[in-house]
Amino acid sequence: MRPAVSIALALVALLVLADSARSEPGEPTLMQKLEQFKENVKVFADNIGEKTKAALQELHDSEFSTKTRNWFSEHFKKVKEKLKDTFA
């Protein structure tokens, strides 16, 4: 490992040990705070994922999207038939 990374990890470990040793009984330790932060980030990411999925599904099912897909399909078939007739 690079020295800077090693030093940073050592400092974080010392901070965790120092914080857990001096915290009051009712106050959450640094590890508990980090664990809670991790849970909050996970819930946030899950919510964003669900909302994004719902928005994309709604966009996919919209009238504009359906009409656009149909238009492209029809025109692609026409071009394909023209090319087939031209080069056959």
Curated annotation (Swiss-Prot):
InterPro entries: ApoC-1_sf (IPR043081), ApoC-I (IPR006781). Coiled coil: none annotated. Residues 1-23 form the signal peptide. It is found in: Secreted. One of its GO terms (molecular function) is fatty acid binding. The keyword Signal applies. Keywords: Lipid transport, Secreted, Signal, Transport, VLDL. GO terms for biological process: lipid transport; lipoprotein metabolic process; negative regulation of cholesterol transport; negative regulation of lipid catabolic process; negative regulation of very-low-density lipoprotein particle clearance; triglyceride metabolic process; very-low-density lipoprotein particle clearance. Disulfide bonds: none annotated. Belongs to the apolipoprotein C1 family. Inhibitor of lipoprotein binding to the low density lipoprotein (LDL) receptor, LDL receptor-related protein, and very low density lipoprotein (VLDL) receptor. Associates with high density lipoproteins (HDL) and the triacylglycerol-rich lipoproteins in the plasma and makes up about 10% of the protein of the VLDL and 2% of that of HDL. Appears to interfere directly with fatty acid uptake and is also the major plasma inhibitor of cholesteryl ester transfer protein (CETP). Binds free fatty acids and reduces their intracellular esterification. This is Apolipoprotein C-I. It comes from Alligator mississippiensis.
